[in-house]
Structures are given as C-alpha cells and as structure tokens.
Swiss-Prot record:
Homodimer. May form a heterodimer with HOX1, HOX2 or HOX3. This is Homeobox-leucine zipper protein HOX7. InterPro entries: HD, HD-ZIP_Homeobox_LZ_Class_II, Homeobox_CS, Homeodomain-like_sf, Leu_zip_homeo. GO terms for cellular component: nucleus. Belongs to the HD-ZIP homeobox family. Class II subfamily. Pfam families: HALZ, Homeodomain. SUPFAM superfamilies: Homeodomain-like (SSF46689). The lineage of its organism: Eukaryota, Viridiplantae, Streptophyta, Embryophyta, Tracheophyta. Residues 150-209 bind DNA.
C-alpha cells in the first residue's frame, strides 16, 4: 500500500477509463494490485483513442463491485481508482494522457527531491568533487606565487620601498627582466609584484597627464569661443554700418566721366595773345567725351574760328572781345569744374 500512496502524490492527475473487465478487490495480494494498475493504464489509452465520455464512480462502489444493469450493453461503468494518479481532470487531460501513453514503472518509487538531497553521493561524484577542489587549490597557489592575488590581498609597501620604487620609476618607466629581478631582490619582493607596481604607476601617470591635457583643451576651447563671438559681433557691426552708409550717401555720378588728365597742371603763357593758341590749349585740355551731348561747346568753336589779329586785317568786335578777355588756367582740383562754365577774369584784374 505504501507504493500505491507514493504514486498518488503526483500533482498531475489523469482521466482513466477501464474496459468491461472484472473489478479486482483491493484486499487481494500485491500481484493482483499491480495487475489492476496496468489495466487502468491500458483503459486510459483506449479512452484517448475512442474519445468516449465517462462518469466517475466512488471507490467504495468499485470495492463492493456493484454494476448498474440499466446501462446499455457494451458500455462499462467508469471507475475512479483509489489512486489519485488516475483522478479525472479536464484541464490537464492532454498532458497526463501523454504521460500515460509513455507508460509507468509501477515497481519503482518516484524520486523525491528531499530524499535525493539526503542520500549520500556516489563514489564517482565524490571523486569528481575532490578533483575540482584540488584544481582550485592549485590555481590559488599559483596565483599567490605569481602575485596574481592582488585583487584579494593588497600589497603593502614600506616607506623605503615606495621611495626606492618612485626613484626607479623616474629613471626608467619600464624595466627589463634583469632590472626587475635585481629590484625585487633588493626590496625583498617578488618580480611579479615589482612588475605590477610599475604597471599601476604608469597607468596613474597616464591618467594624470590625460586630465591635464583635458583641462588645457577646455581652456583653449573657451578662449576660442569668446574670440569667435567677438568677431561675429564685429562683423555684424560692420554690416550694419555698410547698410547705413549705402542708404544715406548714394554713390557720386559722373566721377568716372572726368578727363584722364584731370590732375595735370596746364599753364599758358600770359603774354600770348593769339586766339589759336587759346583754342588749341582748350581743345587739348578737354576731350569732347566730357560733354554728354557729344559736341564741343559753342564758345570754343567760335574761338577756333576767329582769325589771328596779327594777320594785318583790323580786329573785329569778337576778336577784340577775346583779346580783352584772356583765359586764365590754374591747377585743377579733384572735382574739376570745366573752364567754359567758370567765369573768366577781366583783362584789368
């Protein structure tokens, strides 16, 4: 009976139906009880194949062996076995049916987690555990010999050892194997410890240098940012001033139309009284392109047409007029006013 109760502790109940076979009374021997369990498993397999619906019957009715005569012929009463393993359940029918089709070994007791934990391990597992422990101990010993246990145990150096290592680092940041062994023997340390100290010292030096470079770059960046902002303000001010100047003072018109010899000084002899010389000087000084009309002024044309007074004929009124009023040429300024538009001085002045 203990075997049957242990099988009933399984949390996965299944629905079982049995074929119309004679019901065995549980008071018989153990072999017959095993036969009753096998018949129940086979009946469950047939129930999955036929998909027949059954009803349950109490274990007391199964033990008494009562049969309902009102049922149609060919249908057998459904018995719920006394084992909780075969209690019907609609929710877990598929999973339990799969387990039943695989079959159960009724002669073996199901494994229990607590019992397994309490059992003594086999000799092979004990040997493997001891082997793993030995390997771990060997690795720990190797790390301790090579100085690799720094993460678990920090190296403590005296002041003399630290100062000597600092002086050695200032001389040589890296050590050769011979220097490393000599330094380790002198300081009563292992070569691995000396090597690790130098590695850490180089890392700290590099980190400090990186921090210094970072601060320097930050200052340079801030200075360049301020300079860039100042230049942008100056550019904005210059652009505003250029717009104001362009709108207030339009460009002068006609400066590119000035004669090419505007800066040249023209001087005429004051004792010259010949009108031809005056007309020639006027024609040489001013090109016809100065005037927008394209033609020479009427005064210059008339002056060019006046005959010379030294030709023997009496001077006419126009000749007397030009002879009395001799033009006076002086230096031209930047903004030159044509002499034809300037008031000519009198002869008495």
């Amino acid at each position: 009976m203990e075997l049957e109760l242990s099988l009933g502790d399984s949390p996965a109940p299944v629905k079982a139906t049995i074929a119309p076979t004679p019901v065995l009374i549980p008071t018989c021997m153990g072999d017959e009880e095993d036969l009753e369990l096998v018949l129940g498993v086979r009946a469950t397999r047939r129930d999955e194949q036929d998909d027949q619906t059954t009803c349950t019957q109490s274990s007391e009715e199964a033990m008494e062996g009562e049969e309902d005569e009102t049922r149609p012929h060919g249908e057998a009463p459904v018995e719920s076995l006394s084992f909780p393993l075969f209690v019907s359940s609609a929710e877990t029918g598929s999973a339990n049916s799969e387990m039943c089709t695989r079959g159960f070994d009724v002669n073996t007791r199901p494994a229990d987690g607590g019992a397994e934990a309490g059992r003594p391990s086999s000799p092979s597992s004990m040997q493997e555990a001891s082997t793993r422990q030995q390997v771990a101990d060997q690795e720990a010993a190797d790390d301790e010999d090579n100085g690799g246990g720094g993460a678990r145990k920090k190296l403590r150096l005296s002041k003399e050892q630290s100062s000597f290592l600092e002086d050695s680092f200032k001389e040589h940041s890296t050590l050769t194997p011979k220097q490393k062994s000599d330094l380790a023997n002198r300081l009563n340390l292992r070569p691995r410890q000396v090597e690790v100290w130098f590695q850490n010292r180089r890392a700290r030096t590099k980190l400090k240098q990186t921090e210094v470079d970072c601060e320097h770059l930050k200052r340079c960046c801030e200075r360049l940012t301020r300079e860039n902002r100042r230049l942008q303000r100056e550019v904005a001010e210059l652009r505003g001033a250029l717009r104001t100047t362009t709108s207030s003072y339009p460009p002068l018109y006609g400066l590119h139309h000035l004669p090419a010899a505007a800066g040249t000084v023209f001087r005429v002899c004051p004792s010259c009284e010949h009108s031809k010389v005056v007309a020639a000087a006027a024609s040489e000084s001013f090109s016809p392109r100065v005037f927008a009309g394209g033609g020479a002024p009427a005064a210059i044309t008339a002056a060019a047409a006046v005959p010379s007074p030294g030709a023997g004929s009496p001077p006419s009124s126009s000749a007397a007029l030009f002879g009395a009023r001799r033009p006076h040429f002086g230096p031209f300024a930047a903004a030159v006013i044509p002499p034809v538009l300037r008031r000519q001085p009198s002869a008495t002045s």
